[in-house]
Curated annotation (Swiss-Prot):
Belongs to the universal ribosomal protein uL2 family. This is Large ribosomal subunit protein uL2. NCBIfam families: rplB_bact. It comes from Ligilactobacillus salivarius (strain UCC118). Part of the 50S ribosomal subunit. Forms a bridge to the 30S subunit in the 70S ribosome. SMART domains: Ribosomal_L2, Ribosomal_L2_C. The keyword ATP-binding does not apply. GO terms for molecular function: rRNA binding; structural constituent of ribosome; transferase activity. Residues 210-277 are annotated as: Disordered. The keyword rRNA-binding applies. SUPFAM superfamilies: Nucleic acid-binding proteins, Translation proteins SH3-like domain. One of the primary rRNA binding proteins. Required for association of the 30S and 50S subunits to form the 70S ribosome, for tRNA binding and peptide bond formation. It has been suggested to have peptidyltransferase activity; this is somewhat controversial. Makes several contacts with the 16S rRNA in the 70S ribosome.
């Protein structure tokens, strides 16, 4: 994927960049793999805002992605690379030898016409999915399961990858994109290669309207709110925070406060924290 720069014909276009979509080979999605997706605008079942600054945006259909890859030893041909509005990565349309179609995350380097497989004894090549027990140490992987059979949950964003560092008994040791090193059961599956569309992080939105197309609403600073809306609010003019530390809208410290539970059951699987230098 390349980055397309726009001429400064307006102020909004001046610093705007976007994808050139050079990798995309098909513009209309596969109808059988689409489901409707209703908007929540950041509200829960009671209609109360649980996530601020969300609402509006372009209407989308959800693409059913196969994160499990349990159709073993049936070769699938890559028919197209498509855009997915619901994620940063592109997706690949697979057609299996028995005629079944499915979407997967498009790894870096995957081309139309390539054949991919899943199973214990498949080749170590980009797009193939295997249990961690069958993947050589040092291999770059993505779409990693946390529980066997649940489907990939880790390393799914554009340009991300993890590396298999070693194996100890029934656990594999993996270094994630964040730098965290953790143990995962060797019976969990992962896909070979890094996620494609790696230049996604270089895109500059350029104008407020483009953020609105994505369903993101404006964000106000706490210091310009009233005291009943935010701990930083109130005062005459540009008043200071007036507290020992900056606060979240709910009165929690925002600088250095640990949010992870010390009793989290998964702590024992973390070999090295992502926060350690």
């Amino acid at each position: 994927m390349g980055i397309k720069k726009f001429k400064p014909t307006t102020n909004g276009r001046r610093n705007m960049t976007g994808s050139d979509f050079a990798e995309i080979t098909k513009t209309k999605p596969e109808k059988s793999l689409l489901v409707s997706k209703s908007k929540t605008a950041g509200r829960n079942a009671y209609g109360r805002i649980t996530v601020r600054h969300r609402g509006g945006g372009h209407k989308r259909k959800y693409r059913l992605i196969d994160f499990k890859r349990v159709k073993d030893n049936v070769p699938a041909t890559v028919k197209a690379i498509e855009y997915d509005p619901n994620r940063s990565a592109n997706i690949a349309l697979l057609v299996y030898a028995d005629g079944v179609k499915s979407y997967i995350l498009a790894p870096k380097g995957l081309k139309v016409g390539q054949v991919v497989e899943s199973g214990k004894d498949v080749d170590i090549k980009v797009g193939n999915t295997l249990p961690l027990a069958n993947i050589p140490v040092g291999t770059v992987i993505h779409n990693i399961e946390l529980k066997p059979g649940k489907g990939g949950q880790l390393v799914r964003s554009a340009g991300t990858s993890a590396q298999l560092l070693g194996k100890e008994g029934k656990y594999a040791i993996i270094r994630l994109t964040s730098g965290e090193v953790r143990m995962i059961l060797v019976t969990c599956r992962a896909t070979i290669g890094a996620v494609g569309n790696e230049q996604h992080e270089l895109i500059k939105v350029g104008k407020a309207g483009r953020a609105r197309w994505a369903g993101k609403r404006p964000q106000s600073r706490g210091s310009v709110m009233n005291p009943n809306d935010h701990p930083h609010g109130g005062g005459e003019g540009k008043a200071p925070v007036g507290r020992p530390s900056p606060m979240s809208p709910w009165g929690k410290k925002t600088t250095g406060l640990k949010t992870r539970s010390k009793k989290a059951r998964s702590n024992k699987f973390i070999v090295r924290s992502r926060n350690k230098k």
